[in-house]
Structures are given as structure tokens and as C-alpha cells.
Amino acid sequence: MRFFVSCAKGLEYLLVDEVLALGAAGATATVAGVNVEGGLCDAQRLVLWSRLASRVLWPLAAFACADEDALYAGVAALPWVEHVLPGQTLAVDAHVSGEAITHARYAAQRVKDAVVDTLRDAGVVRPSVDVEHPDVRLNLSLRKGRATLSVDLGGRALHHRGWRQAPHAASLKEHLAAAVLLRAGWAKVYAEGGGLLDPMCGSGTLLIEGALMVADVAPGLSRYADPDAMSHVSVAERPVLLPSRWRGFDVVAWEALVVDAQQRARRGLAELRPVLHGSDIDPRALGAASANARAAGVQDAIEFVVAGIDVLPAVSEPHGVVVCNAPYDVRLAADPGLYRHLGDALRRVVPRWRAALVCGSNTLAFATGLRAGKRYQFFNGALECVLIVCDPVVPLAREAGGAQALSEGAQMAANRLRKNVQRLKKWRIRAGVECYRVYDADLPEYAAAIDVYQEVDGARRLFLHVQEYAAPTSIPEGDVRRRRHELLAAVRAVFDVSVAQVALKTRQRGKGGSQYGCFAQRGEFFHVCEHGALLRVNLFDYLDTGLFLDHRPLRGRMAREAVGKRFLNVFCYTGVASVEAAVAGAAATTSVDLSSTYLHWCTDNFALNGQGGVRHRLVQADALAWLEAERGQYDVIFCDPPTFSNSARADDFDVQRDHVRLLRAAVARLTPGGVLYFSNNFRRFRLDVDAVAAFAQCEEISSVTIDLDFSRNTRIHRTWLLWR
């Protein structure tokens, strides 16, 4: 006999394995479920034992269904006196797709009408409706003009285990928790003496499911436990009710299954070791977790501690599994920073453990900074999630700072990196440079720019920012990936950093040309220093980092010239030039940008250096329009526009087309003796010398604004000095 077992999307193949392990003759995955070959006893065993299934549906009939009349007739043709006893309660669930019948509730009503009418005509007391706890629950699937009517052998959704005493916001459903534990290989780790840790355990779902799984407790024992039984009685001793009172249900087989399951539960609970650890920052959540664990009979195996992720509970087991349903969407606004802190904590406390983390998206998974060996998609209700498995949290080759053997290509790249580091060493020490470009496509086959950022506080970590250049379409994608991995291996080996300290921006080929792929969204900011100013940078979340390294010498020159003067920075980005001018002693600064994000970043940079107030003004505006309306005068002006920009709040800007208008407006704001520095990185830019000569004197000074680390690419930007 073929019957259907439904599950959450993404769990189908796990469910196939479970169904076969529980004795079914065959199983085939389909969307959100599994078609199973087996008998009624096999189906009832799944009701009792499956940790993954949502429902077990035993078919009663399948028939063509062109419209509501055909549906009614098909249902009425069944001998309902053989399925429903007089006076029993009934419920009908319906799932419809297609054009014949479009409303599931109406379809369910027509099924109920057909059943009731048939029983009434047979002289049987009609069943009443009980949608919560019916004696018999029917399930209608109507798809592509064909109806399948089944009896729901479990009587209710099987993710209900019966032990949950107190609901908790956005708890992971129990069958999804079981899937996480199975993907993590928890049972095998437990058998080898390992432990289980959930640092954001909430109401304890993952830990309780983990305990019941290794204790060999069937989920159906607590789900169908007699509610009148004493709550202090072990789940292995409580009377177990029938999940369905459908007349075809094999009561004798069910009772035999229950007796066997209770015997196994007694043994498993008696031998269960206390190696499960949970923590959460919310004491109320832990109160619910403790109550749930008591109801499940596993309270002695789980230790609950009130703590945030920065203070993980101490674990004595040398190895184990970390599981976590990190907050996303409904429970808390998705916070990449929280995911980053989680990854940092796991690397620090349990580097050799395996981790299986439920994340709200791939972006949030990337934010952990952990290297996922495996990645799975599934649905928690309507929410699509990603499960990452990291085994171990810190790979052995990474823990020692990248001591793994390098391939021939990676070794070649590493040699070039070491050579560049040595070449720049004396200059960096003399100039006090801590953030610099160490590589710029020196080897053509490894086409990327690599920048080094030295953290100035905390652990003084070293970070690497790797920006891959677009590969020619003639190069196979496999070669592109191989070279990328070799270059990253070289970076980690030379600079002795973990994968979490390397930010990679890759180019992805598409119809619109090469575009950078999605960024990590780790929310990880740290501080660096340039020319005595502290600066906030983020290597992971944006295309740029908050600090254009190539403008370093120009910023230093302007800061020296701005001492005691008024400094204007248009298209200010994160305001680094303004901050350095303020730190150097500028009398006042004005910073203009259209982006509120960058202006907030600029505000943070000023605050880091104890600067701010009315002397340092930030203006959110279209820079060109603001310049043309401004009447103030400035001694030093810095103008570094983008090549092109468009915005719903401002006119489109094209540096080649609009630079004369821009420079005219900026020069008009200069005081007598004032200077304007104009820079851009458009490689094909041509200054309209004749037009500019009509209102200013001009000199190109690009060569003196390029430091040694950018000497391989002197076209990284061009700079002109203008004065009246």
C-alpha cells in the first residue's frame, strides 16, 4: 500500500532516510513529503516514532474531481459506516490547487456534508465537528482535477510533542529541531562521549529534542499521553491514548508498538548522561525551558544558565555539537552584529566542536564569520532559513593561522605577498602607515587588489580586504574559482589570519556584466588609525570599507594646510578627510554628502576623536546643488566626486559631463588665497582645461598624491590643485 507522509520543505530526503530506518518497504521524496510503500502497521509506527513528519495520511479513496458535485459524489461513494462510529467527532483539512475548486474551506465543507449525509442515510447518528481534537481527522488533497481523501492517522500535526508547557515567541518547531540535530550528527557525537550546547536556547526546544533523541524516547509517547495521568510520572510510564479513533485503526498493533517504545524509553532515560548545556539572556525563556524539560522527563540531563553569548556556559566535554536557532525576523530584528558575536564566541570557547546554526538567510550565515562545510535550506513555517554546519568551528589548518600546505599556485602568490610586505616595510615604519595596499594584480592570473587593515584597539587583529577583478569571459569559471581559493590560501598563510579576518569581494558574471556578489552583512566595525585620527571601518558589509587608502597622502597634505582654517569636504563619503583636518587643528569643517548612512558614519568618526559640535558641520544634500546655493567661504576645499551617481532625491551626476560646472561652483567658495583639491578615479577622465582656465588656475598634482603602496597603479586616481 502507498501512503503519504508530509513534512516541512527541505526535510524530504532526511524523512526518506527516517522512514526506511523505521521499516517501510520503500520511500520516494516529493515536494513537502514522502510517498511510502508499507502497511498500516508501518504507518502507525511512523505516527509514534517519526521525529520529522508533519502528518501521516492513509488513503481512503482517489477519484477524478472536475467540480464540487464530483467531489461530493466521490466522497459519498465511500462506505462511511466502516470508517466512523456513531456519535464520533469529525474534522476535515483540505488543500486545493487548480481551477475547479479554489477555496479549501469550501472543499472541506463539501467533504463533511457528504460524510454526514451518507451516515444519516444509513441511519447512523451523525458525527459532530471538532476541529481541535476530533475522533477522526480526514485530509483532502485536490490537485489537477484529482482528489485524494485520506485519514490523518496522527490526529494532529506531529510536530506537537506534548511536553511544551509554556509557549515562547518564535520557538523552532520540534520536527525542525530534530532535523537540525540529525544534520549535525548529534546522536553519533553523543555515543562517542560528546556534549550538546545551545547558547541561545530560548524555551529549550533543541536541547529537549536532543535529549529525547539520544534517550531513544518516541515522540508519540508524550504526544498521546493521557492528560489525566499524574504529571510527575515518567513519560515511559504514562498511559498512551489512541491517536485516531478511525474504525480502520489497528488498535492491537498500536498497543504493541507503545509497549515496545515504553521499554526502550525506560532504558534510554535511565542511561541518559547530563551532557546538555543551554543558556539564554532572557530569564523568562529559561523558566519556560526548565518547565518544558521537566514535562519531557529530561530535566536532570540539561543544565540551564542565564547568560549572553559573550559568556558561554563552561563545558567539560572535549568535543560536542553547538546548535542554535539564532534570532531572525519574528523573534528579533535580524542583527548581523549578533551573528558575528556568536561566531566569535564559538571560535573562542569551543573551537574544536561542531556547530549547526539555523540562520535567517545566507547573509546572516555569512555574518557569523564561520566556514560552513555544509549548507541546507528549509522552511520554519513560512520563513525560509539556512542551516550551516561547521565541522569543526575552527578548521585545524586555520587554527594555527593557515599552516596548511599550499598548492604550487598558492605558493607563488604567497611568495609575491611576502616580497611586497618586505618591500613596503621600511616605508611603512617611517611613515607610520598601518593600513595599506599590499598587492594589486602583481601576478596576472591572480587578479585582485589586497589591502591590509590593522585594528588599533581590542585584540589588534589584522584584517585583509580582497577585491577580485573581473576575469575575462574566456577563462573557465572553474579556473577562476581555483585561483581565487589559491590566492585566499596564500593570504591566510602569509598574514597568519583566520578565514574570519579576510573580507572577499568577488565579481559574478551576469547579463549586465560583472557585478560584485552579495556582501556578508556581519555588522563588524573596527577602528584603524591614519595621521593620528581614529577611523571606523567595515570590510564586510559594503563594496568600500569607509576609508579610501589611495587618498592617504592627499588627506595628510590637506590636514596640514587646514590648520587654523575653514575646511570644506564635498562628496565627503565617511568624512575621513574632514576628521583628519579637525584632528590636525582646522578652525572649522563642513562635510556634505547625500547619503544619510555615510553622514552617520562620519558622525561616528568625529565622535571617536572627540570632535564635533557647531565647528564641525554635516550637511545632507546634493553636493553640486548645495555648492551653487552656498554663500560661505572656505580656505581649503576637497572635492572627490563619484564617476557617476543617480538618486531619487537629486539629479544624475556624471563627472566628465558635469565637472566644469562643479569646479566653477566650488572655486566660487574659495577665500582669497584658498585652494581646491579636485580628485576622481574615472580612468578615461579628461579635464576641460580651457573651460576651467576661464575661472581658475589649475595644476595636476597626481604624482605627489600616490604613495609607495599604490605605485603599481598610478592611475588609481588623478588630482588637480585649483586656485583663483
From Swiss-Prot:
Q: Could you tell me where this protein is found in the cell?
A: Cytoplasm
Using the UniProt record, name the top-level EC class of this enzyme in a single word: transferase
A GO molecular function held by the record: RNA binding
Give Gene Ontology CC terms: cytoplasm
This enzyme catalyses:
guanosine(2445) in 23S rRNA + S-adenosyl-L-methionine = N(2)-methylguanosine(2445) in 23S rRNA + S-adenosyl-L-homocysteine + H(+); guanosine(2069) in 23S rRNA + S-adenosyl-L-methionine = N(2)-methylguanosine(2069) in 23S rRNA + S-adenosyl-L-homocysteine + H(+)
Going by the UniProt record, its keywords in alphabetical order are: Cytoplasm, Methyltransferase, RNA-binding, rRNA processing, S-adenosyl-L-methionine, Transferase
Residues passing through the membrane, by range: none
Under which EC number(s) is this enzyme classified? Answer: 2.1.1.173, 2.1.1.264
Lineage: superkingdom: Bacteria
Q: Name one Pfam family in it.
A: Methyltrans_SAM
Task: Tell me the ranges covered by the THUMP domain, including all copies.
Answer: 42-153
Q: Does the keyword rRNA processing apply?
A: yes
What is the role of the protein in this entry?
A: Specifically methylates the guanine in position 2445 (m2G2445) and the guanine in position 2069 (m7G2069) of 23S rRNA.
Question: Of which family is this protein a member?
Answer: Belongs to the methyltransferase superfamily. RlmKL family.
Q: What is this protein called?
A: Ribosomal RNA large subunit methyltransferase K/L
Gene assigned in the entry = rlmL
